[in-house]
């Protein structure tokens, strides 16, 4: 967890097994009313399998990509995610920092009693870059 209000959790789940463990933990250990996922996956990973495991617990997903040359393009990931989540629950933001800002904006609802969690997942590089960006963002 790198931030509270909104709660932001980083988890480098980069395969379906890891995504299932993340989904189980979120379902059993947290009490979120809504979950926003920021997901960036490497091109050689099972993106469909990862997203299938996350779908039951994620309300909407922001697909993105890290700076790695191995990263799947956000547009390709959007196509996969839209088949699993439906187009109305998927947003594509190719730049990771902008995707994170979008998630924080989506999760910030001053007049709401809802507890909204943000998870960042899909690859070690995505999570590492997100961690660096979020530390700078919230250090201000």
Which sequence ranges carry the predicted segments?
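Cofactor-binding loop segments of dinucleotide-utilizing enzymes, especially the Rossmann-like FAD-
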Residues: 39-44, 65-66, 122
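Periplasmic-binding protein-like
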Residues: 117-121
């Amino acid at each position: 967890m790198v931030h509270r209000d909104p709660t932001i959790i980083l988890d480098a789940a980069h395969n379906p097994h890891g995504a299932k463990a993340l989904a189980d933990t979120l379902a059993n250990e947290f009490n979120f009313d809504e979950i926003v996922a920021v997901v960036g996956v490497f091109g050689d990973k099972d993106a469909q399998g990862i997203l299938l495991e996350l779908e039951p617990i994620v309300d909407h997903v922001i697909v993105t990509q890290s700076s790695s040359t191995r990263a799947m393009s956000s547009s390709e990931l959007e196509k996969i995610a839209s088949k699993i989540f439906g187009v109305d629950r998927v947003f594509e933001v190719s730049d990771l920092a902008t995707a994170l800002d979008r998630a924080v904006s989506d999760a910030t609802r001053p007049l709401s009693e809802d507890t909204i969690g943000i998870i960042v997942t899909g690859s070690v590089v995505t999570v590492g870059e997100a961690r660096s960006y979020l530390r700078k963002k919230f250090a201000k």
